[in-house]
């Protein structure tokens, strides 16, 4: 190296007068550093630290890292278009061996008795024998050059990114955590009071500049101050330390703090969060006091049903010629419903129930069956473009091939799937079918207003209606489909390559499914797909596509085809005390159909599968619960999905809204529940505000004491099965008193609804990790969770006293941010 320097930069003597006083050499240049920088520039690696003391070691280490980065890209992130250029270059050595010859082919055409002929040259590749050795030598000469070019064009990420990712894996327990944190961001400098550099660099690039310990302390105090401003003053408890830790990590992410500095700053910043200024502790003692008014009252309150104040007619241009809606007004007879509520719960949300009357039934049919609202006006639902569902046929073919040919159930086999009141209803239908076969009249709809809990915050929404067909029709169609539902959903899962149809799983199992889905991706992002009134948007074409699944399982079955055809042309009547409504509707999913759930699963899965194939995106995960879906993708594909998904579904006749993306697992909302970590793993937990307000309301008539006991027992056992080990929610359901089981009767079968309370339960305790995860899901800090649990401990239910008055005491749930 010194010899090279002397040749390039010779010594120059400095003379003063006639005497030489020294030797001057230009500023020395480190050739090693120069070569490193040139190589790095050529290799597009960014800045990395030089840890080798010789050029040969550096080059060897660089090649190893380069090979490893390209191999990782091929194994984990490859896409079809990444390797077009390398494969094209690899074919260059074969070109000298090939020769293109042209052969002439005579083509004759006869038109109206006249013949025309012409010669068409046709190119053809061949390997001529003449000059083969020369061509082979040229190909061999090009081979090493092309091999180097192929290697140079193989895709990979920047070597600095790969090196940091590798180092992060060695120092962090969770490899996914190291991958998630590495996001490309520009470098940033933080200046001190005197203009000095506090932190230099970014999360993606390491630089030689370092930060001394005395520089880190002021930044830790500053981060702690910002964290307290975000979540407030919290007590020094394990769960609150975890909450502060999460907030501080987010702040350091935005500030691009290096990992080596984070390791020192994080514990100091967490400690600074609990160091308060003078007077803060005295003030916190006031607002943090748990000595509030006792909540003794928990009596039962009866709230009357409501009637909608909106009366709208169907515009003349909406109905098809074969569609009808006739309203006949009867005597003003009213049969009001009631909703019962337990007073004293720490939530101000209130719910009401719609009465079963003519005004509610008419508005429900007009706005939830016939019309949708667009720009303040009623209009017909959007219709699919011609051939749009035909493009989804590959999905149907793949699913049906996995299921194979099915066989129809006997009557006894169909009845074995039911128990209780539904078994008695279907048994009578089977006895009737032995006498008279099924007919078109059995497919007619009986319509009534659904008794559901309506939040008062929604104003005056359109009532929901239920439209069941005759049990005789359900029995005949159920013999074809009831036993095939699980097989079809399993086949859909196989086509997607993972669990996709979320049905029949416990809350713990669904939480574990979402954890596995989330861990599949390097940088996951979840978006909710909100299908506005999915059943109403099911057009005739959509229903025909769904029916094609069933016809493929029973090829040539005429009775099944007839039963399915009756679903395309619906006739129904609605009887209420003050009138009747008769209607005919083409298409539209009827909420009482036996294949409603299965059909919605198949339609939504098929449309999402077709959409992702349309985009050419293979890395995605779908969680489907009928019309409620969550799509998990890589962050780099987010903008493509957000920009094109609504238009694609509109071509299929569905109004689909893409909800705001979430980048943390606890923020994912699926069926009004969030994944929350607890002692046993992950569990889907209902929104705490919805659970604590909705579940103290009951739309069933619980005036008799036996039904009240059954309802309280069902809330206690079912709620704990769904929320064992979860903060706040477990304490809430434990407050429902347990009573001796009453004598079993039909009403209690309706109230208990055992199938709705599937959960693992278990003896789990609330841990600091579960409190931190609960905070990430619902925005309630550890202190707020403890305060709510203390409030619930003082809440006593009295279900057998006289009816009380609705009263509300303010709580944390009223002002906490969801």
UniProtKB/Swiss-Prot annotation:
This is RNA-directed RNA polymerase. Residues 524-641 form the RdRp catalytic domain. One of its GO terms (biological process) is viral RNA genome replication. One of its GO terms (molecular function) is nucleotide binding. Belongs to the tombusviridae RNA polymerase family. RNA-dependent RNA polymerase that plays an essential role in the virus replication. It is an enzyme of class 2 (transferase). InterPro entries: DNA/RNA_pol_sf, Rev_trsase/Diguanyl_cyclase, RNA-dir_pol_PSvirus, RNA_pol_HCV, Tombusvirus_p33. Its EC number is 2.7.7.48. Transmembrane segments: none annotated. Signal peptide: none annotated. It comes from Cymbidium ringspot virus. Pfam families: RdRP_3 (PF00998), Tombus_P33 (PF08500).
């Amino acid at each position: 190296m010194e010899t090279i320097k002397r040749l390039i930069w010779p010594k120059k003597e400095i003379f003063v007068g006639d005497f030489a006083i020294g030797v001057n050499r230009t500023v020395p240049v480190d050739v090693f550093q120069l070569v490193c920088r040139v190589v790095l520039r050529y290799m597009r690696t960014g800045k990395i630290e030089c840890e080798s003391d010789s050029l040969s070691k550096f080059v060897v280490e660089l090649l190893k890292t380069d090979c490893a980065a390209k191999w990782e890209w091929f194994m984990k992130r490859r896409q079809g278009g990444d390797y077009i250029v390398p494969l094209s270059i690899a074919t260059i050595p074969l070109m000298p061996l090939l020769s293109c010859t042209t052969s002439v082919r005579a083509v004759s055409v006869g038109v109206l008795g006249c013949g025309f002929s012409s010669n068409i040259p046709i190119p053809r590749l061949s390997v001529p024998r003449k000059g083969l050795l020369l061509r082979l030598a040229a190909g061999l000469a090009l081979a090493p050059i092309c091999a180097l070019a192929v290697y140079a064009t193989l895709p990979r990420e920047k070597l600095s990114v790969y090196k940091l990712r590798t180092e992060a894996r060695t120092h962090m327990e969770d490899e996914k955590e190291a991958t998630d944190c590495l996001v490309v961001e520009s470098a940033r400098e933080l200046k001190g009071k005197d203009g000095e550099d506090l932190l230099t660099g970014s999360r993606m690039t390491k630089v030689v500049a370092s930060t001394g310990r005395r520089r880190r302390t002021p930044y830790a105090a500053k981060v702690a101050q910002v964290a307290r401003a975000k979540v407030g003053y919290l007590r020094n408890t394990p769960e609150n330390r975890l909450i502060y830790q999460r907030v501080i990590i987010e702040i350091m992410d935005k500030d691009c703090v290096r990992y080596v500095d984070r390791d020192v700053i994080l514990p100091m910043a967490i400690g600074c969060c609990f160091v308060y200024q003078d007077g803060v502790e005295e003030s916190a003692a006031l607002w943090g006091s748990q000595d509030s008014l006792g909540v003794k009252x928990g009596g039962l309150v009866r709230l009357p049903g409501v009637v909608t104040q909106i009366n709208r007619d169907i515009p003349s241009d909406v109905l098809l010629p074969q569609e009808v809606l006739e309203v006949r007004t009867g005597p003003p007879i009213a049969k009001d419903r009631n909703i019962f509520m337990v007073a004293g719960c720490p939530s101000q949300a209130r719910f009401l129930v719609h009465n079963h009357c003519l005004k509610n039934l008419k508005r429900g049919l007009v706005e939830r069956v016939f019309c949708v609202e667009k720009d303040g006006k009623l209009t017909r639902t959007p219709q699919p473009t011609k051939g749009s569902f035909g493009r989804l046929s590959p999905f149907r073919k793949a699913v049906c091939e996995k299921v194979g040919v099915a066989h129809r159930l006997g009557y006894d086999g169909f009845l074995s799937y039911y128990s209780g009141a539904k078994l008695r209803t279907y048994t009578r239908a089977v006895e009737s079918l032995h006498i008279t076969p099924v007919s078109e009249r059995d497919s007619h709809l009986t319509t009534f207003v659904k008794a559901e809990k309506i939040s008062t915050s929604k104003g005056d929404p359109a009532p929901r209606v239920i439209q069941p067909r005759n049990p005789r029709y359900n029995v005949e169609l159920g013999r074809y489909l009831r036993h095939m539902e699980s097989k079809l959903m399993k086949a859909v899962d196989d086509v997607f390559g993972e669990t996709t149809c979320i049905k029949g799983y416990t809350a713990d199992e669904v939480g574990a499914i979402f954890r596995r889905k989330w861990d599949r991706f390097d940088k996951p992002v979840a978006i909710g797909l909100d299908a506005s009134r999915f059943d109403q948007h099911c057009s005739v074409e959509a229903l025909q596509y769904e029916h094609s699944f069933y016809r493929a399982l029973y090829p040539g079955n005429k009775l099944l085809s007839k039963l399915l055809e009756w679903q395309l042309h619906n006739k129904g009547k609605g009887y209420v005390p003050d009138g009747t409504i008769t209607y005919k509707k083409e298409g539209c999913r009827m909420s009482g159909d036996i294949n409603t759930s299965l059909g919605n699963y198949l339609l939504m899965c098929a449309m999402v599968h077709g959409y992702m194939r349309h985009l050419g995106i293979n890395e995605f995960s779908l969680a489907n619960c009928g019309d409620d879906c969550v799509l998990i993708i890589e962050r780099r594909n987010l903008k493509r999905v957000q920009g094109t998904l609504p238009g694609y579904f509109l071509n299929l006749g569905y109004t689909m809204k893409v909800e705001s993306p979430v980048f943390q697992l606890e923020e994912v909302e699926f069926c009004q529940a969030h994944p929350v970590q607890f002692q046993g793993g992950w569990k889907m937990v209902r929104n705490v505000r919805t659970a604590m307000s909705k579940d103290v309301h009951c739309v069933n008539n619980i005036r008799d004491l036996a039904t009240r006991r059954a309802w309280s027992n069902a809330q206690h056992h079912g709620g704990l099965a769904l929320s064992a080990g979860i903060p706040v929610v477990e304490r809430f359901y434990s407050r429902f008193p347990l009573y001796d089981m009453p004598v079993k009767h039909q009403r209690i079968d309706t109230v208990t609804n055992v199938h709705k309370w599937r959960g693992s339960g278990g003896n789990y305790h609330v841990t600091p990790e579960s409190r931190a995860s609960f905070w990430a899901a619902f925005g309630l800090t550890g202190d707020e969770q403890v305060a709510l649990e203390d409030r619930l401990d003082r809440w006593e239910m009295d279900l057998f006293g006289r009816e009380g008055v609705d009263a509300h005491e303010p709580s944390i749930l009223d002002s906490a941010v969801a």
